[in-house]
Curated annotation (Swiss-Prot):
<dbReference type="GO" id="GO:0005829">
    <property type="term" value="C:cytosol"/>
</dbReference>
<dbReference type="Pfam" id="PF03652">
    <property type="entry name" value="RuvX"/>
</dbReference>
<protein>
    <recommendedName>
        <fullName>Putative pre-16S rRNA nuclease</fullName>
        <ecNumber>3.1.-.-</ecNumber>
    </recommendedName>
</protein>
<dbReference type="GO" id="GO:0004518">
    <property type="term" value="F:nuclease activity"/>
</dbReference>
<keyword id="KW-0540">Nuclease</keyword>
<keyword id="KW-0690">Ribosome biogenesis</keyword>
<comment type="function">
    <text>Could be a nuclease involved in processing of the 5'-end of pre-16S rRNA.</text>
</comment>
<dbReference type="GO" id="GO:0000967">
    <property type="term" value="P:rRNA 5'-end processing"/>
</dbReference>
<keyword id="KW-0963">Cytoplasm</keyword>
<keyword id="KW-0378">Hydrolase</keyword>
<dbReference type="InterPro" id="IPR005227">
    <property type="entry name" value="YqgF"/>
</dbReference>
<dbReference type="InterPro" id="IPR037027">
    <property type="entry name" value="YqgF/RNaseH-like_dom_sf"/>
</dbReference>
<dbReference type="InterPro" id="IPR012337">
    <property type="entry name" value="RNaseH-like_sf"/>
</dbReference>
<dbReference type="InterPro" id="IPR006641">
    <property type="entry name" value="YqgF/RNaseH-like_dom"/>
</dbReference>
<comment type="similarity">
    <text>Belongs to the YqgF nuclease family.</text>
</comment>
Amino acid sequence: MSLPAGREATLLAFDYGEKRIGVAVGNSLTRRARPLVIVQNRSREYRFEAVGKLIAEWKPDALVVGLPFHPDGAPHEMTQLAKRFGNQLNGRFNLPVTWVDERYSSVEAKAEIRAGNGRADMLDAEAASIILQQYLDGLSDDHEFH
């Protein structure tokens, strides 16, 4: 998805897990991400109702979903589950989804929390924030989404 230069865009990012989904929000002009909330992944209906409320509240222009890989870059079982989740987000909410390699995002989130820069009960949201920050850091100056 491409945006005109200088246009502000709100983004929601997701760190998908079988039990919890971390959510972060960010802005393309400030290029800052912050942890938002953790959605309990109880059932398909529950998670999409919760995500739908977040989308209605934040009105994002695009979504970012972290894709987990093994350290060597090989996919594993969670890679496919996260990809399915992102595809379902796109289908349900008609918003563009961008994938970000999330290797080490949880490790980095734990380090941030240990350093006093986050809350332990928000670990998954911190990981989503790291995923989104990686994406924002990669944006070109004309805000072209990849």
